[in-house]
């Protein structure tokens, strides 16, 4: 989530979108086959969306969460994302920060959070929610324990456990397979501002911090308990690191909203090296890999937070196709 909201929103609404050229970058391994290379940009077919997170499956289906409280889905090779799961009294979705497609378990996980920009849907408890990945039927609701929390992003561990970040309180929660409630996996003052979360192929957990502009490796013992954090040395100065998605091996896709940057992050030991794909987007809180393409969202959140833009209607809400090769 961007550092203009109470948990750290990001605004860069005056910048124009222009993709910088990417020369000589070869990415080994993709989230889907290269058959989606000609798909192009994707339009979200709705108004007042303000997308915040994006995820994808191996066939190229893309899912987008939004401040509006809806999940939008673009089927493989389609360039329009349509409302798929919509907020209702029955499902209790408030606004949506993180979304994550868990193909192994057939589940779409999302973070429901009280609406910072209310008054509609501004009351309630932040929760991790589960929906069937095929039908969109709600399967579970897992409220975050007090104090007031903000579930921000999600990752799946090697054993199928679900991990979710709590930005304002610096906590990571875990939902083990078959469990009916979240348990505290770890907490640390250095995690206040925690946002993106992802596992490497070897099972190592990494997180970023949208407030302190850092990336950490999460240390754990053989019992699977968090024992500490290791701050990584980063090749570039970060600005509001947000969505963090595993690509393959020790490579990740990271979005930074305030500077409109999407990068591949390669982690070797205690060093994280960024290969910049673009730094000319506007307030981009997330990106997801589909084949050789990163699909990046522009939130246009400034139209909710910037007095100069508040009475100006935003343009179309888009996912922009950024080459990863």
Regions found by a protein language model. Give the residues of each.
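A short loop-to-beta-strand structural motif that recurs across blades of beta-propeller domains
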Residues: 70-72, 127-129, 171-173, 214-216, ...
């Amino acid at each position: 989530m961007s550092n203009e909201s109470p948990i750290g929103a990001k605004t860069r609404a005056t910048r124009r979108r222009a993709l910088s050229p990417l020369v000589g970058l070869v990415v080994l391994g993709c989230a889907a086959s290269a058959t989606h290379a000609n798909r192009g940009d994707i339009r979200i077919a709705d108004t007042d969306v303000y997308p915040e997170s994006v995820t994808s499956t191996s066939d190229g289906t893309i899912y987008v969460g939004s401040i509006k409280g809806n999940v939008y889905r673009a089927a493989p090779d389609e360039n329009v994302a349509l409302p798929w799961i919509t907020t209702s009294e029955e499902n209790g979705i408030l606004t949506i920060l993180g979304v994550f497609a868990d193909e192994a378990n057939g589940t779409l996980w999302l973070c429901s959070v009280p609406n910072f920009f209310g008054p509609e849907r501004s009351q309630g408890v932040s929760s991790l929610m589960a929906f069937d990945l095929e039908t969109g039927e709600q399967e579970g609701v897992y409220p975050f324990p007090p104090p007031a929390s903000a579930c921000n992003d999600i990752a799946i561990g090697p054993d199928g456990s679900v991990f979710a970040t709590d930005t304002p309180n610096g906590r990571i929660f875990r939902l083990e397979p078959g469990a009916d409630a979240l348990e505290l996996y770890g907490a640390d003052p250095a995690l206040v501002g925690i946002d993106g979360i992802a596992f490497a192929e070897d099972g190592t957990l990494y997180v970023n911090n949208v407030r302190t502009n850092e990336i950490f490796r999460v240390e754990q013992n053989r019992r699977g308990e968090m024992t500490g954090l290791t701050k990584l040395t980063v090749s570039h100065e970060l600005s509001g690191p947000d969505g963090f998605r595993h690509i393959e091996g020790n490579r990740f896709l990271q979005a930074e909203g305030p500077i409109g940057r999407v990068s591949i992050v390669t982690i070797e030991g205690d060093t994280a090296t960024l290969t910049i794909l673009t730094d000319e987007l506007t307030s981009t809180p997330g990106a997801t890999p589909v084949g050789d393409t990163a699909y990046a969202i522009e939130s246009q959140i400034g139209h909710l937070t910037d007095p100069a833009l508040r009475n100006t209607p935003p343009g179309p809400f888009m996912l922009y196709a950024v080459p990863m090769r």
